[in-house]
């Protein structure tokens, strides 16, 4: 294989795997957000409130990107028996992303008003619910890969192997 062919294959594989690559960053950031927010609620003077804002914003941007890439990557499976299983995963993913977008908007408004809600129990509850939705998204996404072989090379259901 020439380096041009290898590069072309690498680019094609990366585009095909984009969703799988993108999902792990927002998962890590938003789960960490839940832990740090709990710490801030328990220790209000910890100085970590700004850290939770950064985790929320970057994690939410990543979640939106991962959700969009997931919607795009599911199109080849529209007419397959796996469509229902994929829709279940999509529902959890869209719900988690929507909740974190709403939390980001809520917190942004509260910060502009000079009273950051990021250290409140109510904000922690919202983040905890979002983390639960994110966990369900991850579990159903894992099922797609490990139980159904979605996007696993050599076992791709679209190829009949």
Regions found by a protein language model. Give the residues of each.
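Polytopic transmembrane helical bundles with strong interfacial aromatic enrichment
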Residues: 1-161
């Amino acid at each position: 294989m020439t380096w041009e062919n290898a590069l072309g294959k690498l680019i094609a594989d990366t585009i095909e795997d984009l969703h799988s690559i993108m999902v792990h960053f927002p998962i890590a950031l938003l789960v960490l957000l839940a832990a740090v927010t709990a710490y801030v609620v328990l220790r209000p003077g910890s100085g970590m409130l700004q850290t939770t804002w950064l985790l929320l914003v970057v994690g939410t941007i990543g979640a939106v990107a991962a959700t969009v890439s997931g919607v795009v990557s599911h199109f080849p499976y529209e007419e397959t028996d796996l469509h229902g299983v994929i829709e279940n995963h999509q529902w959890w993913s869209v719900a988690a992303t929507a909740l974190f977008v709403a939390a980001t908007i809520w917190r942004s408004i509260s910060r502009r008003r000079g009273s950051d809600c990021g250290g409140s129990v109510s904000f922690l509850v919202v983040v905890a619910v979002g983390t639960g939705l994110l966990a369900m998204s991850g579990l159903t996404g894992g099922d797609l890969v490990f139980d159904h072989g979605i996007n696993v090379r050599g076992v791709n259901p679209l190829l009949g192997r």
